[in-house]
Amino acid sequence: MRVLTKQEIAEACELIAQDAFCADIFDIATETLRFLDPPREISTLEYSIEHRKIRQSDGETADWSLDLTPYLAQPMAALDAPGIHEVIVPKPARSGGTVVAENYALKTMEFGPAGDIMWYLAGPDEVGSYAERVFKPLFEDHEGVAAKIGGGPSDTTLRRKRIGGYTVELLAMSGKTTTNRQGRFIVFDEPDSYSKKFTSNFLEQGRQRQRMVGSLRKIY
């Protein structure tokens, strides 16, 4: 601890009198008011058509189109339906099913209903690959969502984002990642590739993670 000189104390008092150590009230108001805006009523399908960008292999983006995968409209509508809490989609590989979850997640991050999102993949390698290929571009290519990311040093990492007080996180399916956690929207991505322990009970794991969420809970 260092004792300040009289001159330093006088200078500090002068700065205090000038509110030099206070945050700008306009900045505080601007940052806070955006959370008071009522959420826009928009369906996942409408959001997808208006806002969703798909990152191409060459780095360019293209607008998502229902014409290419018209069968995805029904799963999106199911996620929006108040009385439906679990949407199970048996599907072949690369049929666009994961895009449904991505579109719903993007819509809720930008327009609500807000809540923690937990996205489970088979293991660390799968998490790393998805984070680079998809998760990172999701935020880079959608300005409305990116604008809501917190400004703290831990609010944005490759596998985790904090959006308006809630977290969106990629997780490797394991006993450690399925305990003491809670999420409003839980995605089980390619569950057939999970370890035998979780292949048979991943849905029950999700239900346990949503016991305190209430009627807004969704599992995909």
Give residue ranges: language-model regions.
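Phosphate/NTP-binding elements of NTP-utilizing enzymes
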Residues: 2-220
